[in-house]
């Protein structure tokens, strides 16, 4: 209702879930105000990372997109922001991802900013309750950066999720996609 009444979606989310952002190093001023930028970030918390990234980008520029699981486009407030990725390992999924990368490159060449989690899924641990790590970067990200000529700005989210979520995440490949 608040968003329908004109409030900023990202601010409503941060307030509603009482999210506190603590910048340890750097500044939002380090994100270029103009020109193509790719924000790369680790993915320790799942959905929360995308919401935080959206909030951060909304504070710096209006021309941003986030590459994320296509399911998030079902939320009408995110439809214009999300560049959808498919995790289906079939022809349809591959075509979706190629189209998304091409759309992201066009958006970047137009001077926009795109946020991405280069590992593609939420950090997970090799052994239950060991330190979770992001997966290796996908070629998707390197191609996006190289073909767009964008400036790359890293963002690091410190911390990790609860022991209960670690257990669920360790046992569910599907959960890592959100």
Regions found by a protein language model. Give the residues of each.
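Membrane-anchoring hydrophobic helices of lipid-metabolizing enzymes
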Residues: 1-40, 50-52, 59-63, 79-80
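Short amphipathic alpha-helices and their capping/turn segments at secondary-structure boundaries
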Residues: 100-110
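A short secondary-structure junction signal
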Residues: 50-52, 77-79, 118-119, 125-130, ...
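Surface-exposed cleft-lining segments at the edges of enzyme active sites
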Residues: 86-96, 124-132
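A structural motif
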Residues: 110-121
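A cross-family acyltransferase "interaction/gating" segment
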Residues: 113, 125-178
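Catalytic core of membrane glycerolipid acyltransferases/transacylases, capturing the structured
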Residues: 38-94
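Hydrophobic/aromatic ligand-binding patch that stacks against planar heteroaromatic rings
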Residues: 56, 106, 143-144
């Amino acid at each position: 209702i608040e968003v329908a009444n004109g409030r900023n979606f990202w601010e409503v989310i941060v307030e509603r879930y009482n999210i506190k952002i603590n910048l340890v190093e750097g500044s939002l001023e380090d994100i270029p105000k103009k020109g193509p930028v790719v924000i790369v970030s680790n993915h320790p918390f799942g959905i929360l990372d995308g919401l935080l990234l959206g909030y951060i980008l909304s504070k710096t520029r209006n021309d941003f997109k986030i590459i994320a699981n296509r399911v998030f486009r079902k939320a009408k407030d995110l439809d214009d922001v999300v560049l959808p990725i498919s995790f289906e390992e079939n022809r349809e999924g591959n075509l979706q991802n190629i189209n998304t990368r091409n759309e992201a490159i066009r958006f970047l060449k137009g001077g926009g900013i795109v946020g991405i989690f280069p590992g593609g899924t939420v950090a997970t641990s090799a052994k239950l309750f060991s330190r979770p790590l992001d997966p290796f970067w996908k070629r998707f990200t390197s191609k996006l950066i190289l073909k767009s000529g964008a400036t790359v700005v890293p963002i690091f989210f410190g911390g990790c999720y609860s022991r209960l979520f670690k257990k669920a995440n360790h046992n569910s490949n599907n959960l890592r996609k959100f």
